[in-house]
């Protein structure tokens, strides 16, 4: 049996700063995701836990602990004394890392529904540890990454709508995501010490995506016209602003008639 990785990596060079991902068919005849890294490759299952393991006989460690929690709540009519120990949290953090690596790869492959699935899983891990970890350190360990996962979830849901030419739905998702992240960042700035992750960058990425979606909209779309109007007013081009207002009135009237 050939075990040299060069047989896998020939013709697939590592490029610093670039996320290089591909899908292959494994020896079990199922699809796998491979991500090129320096000196090697990471491989993930497409569904279930990324490493293919079934901890405690469950699809994931998260599901195992969620079931534990539900059983505890049924038995004790609440969750006041339910706790996750340090080792539980360490293993959950590792699992969250696996899902993170896969959803980043899936995003490159533009498989947005799968990105939504994995980011939601990551957010569930973060929230579970934050609420039930026995130690403050374990409660806070993943919290700094929540906004990134939320941002990626928002991008995935919005871009899935855009793929279907549902631009206004995609824009609404981004707008809601921006508001949620701005509130989260404001709370962190007010109460938490500075952390190593700049959460404001997540807002910036969504603002940029909002602009990209608006740019791809039809010229008669109200969000696009409103953006053009704001730009004209900022440039003090009042003649252009008047013309755009007329187009907005026509577009709004047509939209109102179509909704009747």
For each predicted feature, which ranges?
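Acidic, Ser/Thr-rich low-complexity linear motifs
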Residues: 81-86, 131-147, 186-199
């Amino acid at each position: 049996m050939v075990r040299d990785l060069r047989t896998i990596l020939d013709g697939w060079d590592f490029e610093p700063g670039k996320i290089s991902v591909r899908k292959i068919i494994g020896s079990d005849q199922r699809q796998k995701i491979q991500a090129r890294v320096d000196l090697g490759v990471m491989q993930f299952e497409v569904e279930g836990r990324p490493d293919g393991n079934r901890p405690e006989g469950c699809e994931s460690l998260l599901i195992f602990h969620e079931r534990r929690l539900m059983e505890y709540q049924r038995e004790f009519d609440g969750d006041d004394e339910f706790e996750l120990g340090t080792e539980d949290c360490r293993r959950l953090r590792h699992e969250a890392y696996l899902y993170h690596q896969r959803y980043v790869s899936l995003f490159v492959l533009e498989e947005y529904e799968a990105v939504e699935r994995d980011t939601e899983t990551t957010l569930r891990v973060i929230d579970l540890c934050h609420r039930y970890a026995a130690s403050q350190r374990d409660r806070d360990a993943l919290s700094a990454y929540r906004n990134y996962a939320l941002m990626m979830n928002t991008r995935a849901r919005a871009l899935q709508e855009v793929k279907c030419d549902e631009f206004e739905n995609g824009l609404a998702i981004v707008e809601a995501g921006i508001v949620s992240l701005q509130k989260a960042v404001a709370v962190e700035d007010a109460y938490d010490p500075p952390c190593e992750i700049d959460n404001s960058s997540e807002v910036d990425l969504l603002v940029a995506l909002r602009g990209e979606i608006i740019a791809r909209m039809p010229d008669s779309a109200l969000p696009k016209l409103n953006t053009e109007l704001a730009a004209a007013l900022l440039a003090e081009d009042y003649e252009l602003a008047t013309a755009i207002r007329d187009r907005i009135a026509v577009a709004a009237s047509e939209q109102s008639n179509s909704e009747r």
